[in-house]
Amino acid sequence: MDLRSARSALLLFPRLFAVYVCLAFVLFSSAQPPLPIPPVLTGTDIQLTLQEGTWEFHPDEVVPTYGYNGDLLGPTIMLDQGQAVTLNVTNTLPDLTTTHWHGMHVSPMNDGGPHSLIYPNTTWSPSFTVLDRASTFWYHPHGHGLTDYQVTMGAAGMIIVRDALEAALVLPRTYAIDDIPLILQTKAIVGGMLSVHTGLDSVVVVNGARQPLAEVPAQVVRLRCLNGSSERTFHLGFENDMPFHVIGTDGGLLAAPLPKTRLRLMPGERVELLVDLSGMQGGTFSMIAFNSELPNGIIGAAEVGNGMATLDGYNDNALNGADFQLLSFSVTAPTSDPITSIPAEFVPVLPYNEADADLTRSFTFTPEGTMPMEMIEGPFEINGALMDMDVFNEVVPLGSTEIWEFTNNTMVGHPIHIHDIQFNILDRSGMPPEDWETGWKDVVYVPSMGSARVITRFDDFADPEMPYMYHCHLLMHEDEGMMGQFLVIDPNAIGETKAGQRTMHVWPQPFSNGRLNLRTALLNGNLNVVLRDAFGRIVHVSTANFTEGSAGIYPSQLAPGLYAVQILSRDGQLHSATFIVQP
């Protein structure tokens, strides 16, 4: 045997071993734990407590964990479109945290991003009206630099939103009976602890149980699948290529069901599937991650890198590039009122028109350093910068329709999540997206050395001080700085601010460079003009010569964001106004 053949055999062995382990697990399915079903929270005033706990992932394998209202994960929150809700999140952890309502269309003050810190032994209580379509969302911590640790420790839960259009369809919706939540994750347990920032995540769990067994009735069953992993992608399917129908993605139902035997689910993504189990009473089957079929460059595939270099320890994880069981199902008797057919149509999906876009923004992913391994390991920058809590990277006008174009100049595929909105995927590396990706999405896969374009509209919420986030949902990448911030600004609310009886007008809006014009009544002569950024820091001071209330200044090198211009007149009156800067 030559050296290349020997190396190939060594690389193949762990993947064959993973398949063997999965098959053995199926043969001894009596040892499988039952699928845990998270309890449900409903109503207009919901209590969540983020707490420490312990969890037994396997006999004699009890580890410290985090959870909402329990030891691991959290309850499923059920909401109705149009209802008002207050979500009271109490933090009993020893650390700072936040809670983000992933995928939901809420104001930036209610979004739960890194600026909405919840200190230990305090409660954060966002209130909002549910505007979203019927879909599957989720919630999880989002503190900058803390997300991967707290999610890995177990802090996450599912959100189900219902609406009148979905309620009118003949679909399974009896929770835990024919409408099953599945939170798919992999964990690494090292030295009796859950390990973070590691490629050793070889423990496969669904709803916190290790490759469990679910009982489902012999009828059409709905599976709400959430990839809650830190990094691993799952190429979903069922044994023997049993068909399923995709009926919904991140932000809502599709226009019609799509028959499939495989579907790629990246971290942060959700998908709703229907499986028709009519006539299968007494049978069993398994959901499989067919990760041997993933293209290289995706974490979970056989290879990440260029064949000469890869992630540290990547080839030591038997799951990488292997097919493995996620969970199995035992088919029981049908319910008294079973769903036995799949509707031919669901709800209209009216995508945004590319011709209506007001602006295209470009985002390029590159490694922070120049070493070859950093093309694989990172940290990764967006447009040449790591996340800075004090920098607003983009300023978006309220009501604008925009194309966001992502270019990935790294050796790793990135799932990119945009807060606030749902978007339509226009193309990926110049090719149309998968047919099941043509609905509403808030996570888009950007392949290694490839690109993706999405289109969306920014409606309803504007805030001149509190940003939304966009970031990679590989949580280690996010924590290391592969994240940016954007403000949504109402242009009609910018430019005039009263100070007592004095007003000032500032233009052009938005400002980029050159002369910034100021006009305010009753000012004459030389006066100091101060510019402050959204955090109150002085970024520019100059003297302007006012003639009959008008003057101009020439600020330079202002980063995109919101600014205040302030002038103290000789009679002690403060004249101020706000303006936005865009590149």
Task: Label the predicted regions.
Residues 132-133, 278-281, 462-464, 523, ...:
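Surface-exposed, short loops/turns at beta-strand junctions within beta-sandwich domains
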Residues 362-425, 442-465, 471:
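C-terminal substrate/ligand-recognition segments
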Residues 143, 289, 474, 567-569:
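Conserved structural position at the C-terminal beta-strand
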Residues 14-26:
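Bacterial N-terminal signal peptides
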Residues 1-4, 11, 20, 495-583:
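C-terminal outer-membrane/trafficking sorting elements
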Residues 31-273, 295, 305-367, 444, ...:
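Histidine-centered copper-binding motifs that mark active-site loops
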Residues 297-301, 484-485, 574-580:
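Edge beta-strands of extracellular beta-sandwich domains
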Residues 137, 285, 563-566:
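A short tyrosine-centered beta-strand micro-motif
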